Amino acid sequence: DIVVAKVSASFIQAFSKIGLIPDSGGTFTLPRLIGMQRASALMMMGDKVSATDAQNMGMIYKVFADDVYEAEVQKIALQLAQMPTYGLALTKKALNQTFNNTLEAQLELEDVLQTMAGNSEDYKEGTSAFLEKRMPVFKGK
């Protein structure tokens, strides 16, 4: 869901250099991440992409120095764990349908999921914490 990389990481679609095509869903995923033109060029040319360039293209969320990578990943995991995970799960459900749905169907799904989120204990806790000027304590419910 959230893709991060070490600054030393690189990415390559080298299939074209040996007469093959990208597989394992590469022709499906990469164009959706970075656009058809850029994906076509990377897949046909077989260029190596640095982690920083991958971030700039939208392939990954963040790049961390190698020596702090593990600590930064732990920070992200902790931050997510302390968030309203029920709402995050509903967000993921909506995102999973975005390329399959029409705009109308996606708006209907968002309406259903937003109603579910709005009836959650986490939403009540989040709004109470905001009004009381305190940090929320979410339970994933």
Model-derived segments and spans:
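Glycine- (often His-adjacent) and acidic-residue-rich active-site loop
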Residues: 17-19, 98-102
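Helix-loop "lid/cap" segments that line or gate small-molecule binding pockets
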Residues: 42-43, 94-98, 113-118
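Bacterial helix-turn-helix/winged-helix DNA-binding modules and their immediately adjacent linkers
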Residues: 73, 102-106
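Short C-terminal tail/terminal secondary-structure segment
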Residues: 99, 135-141
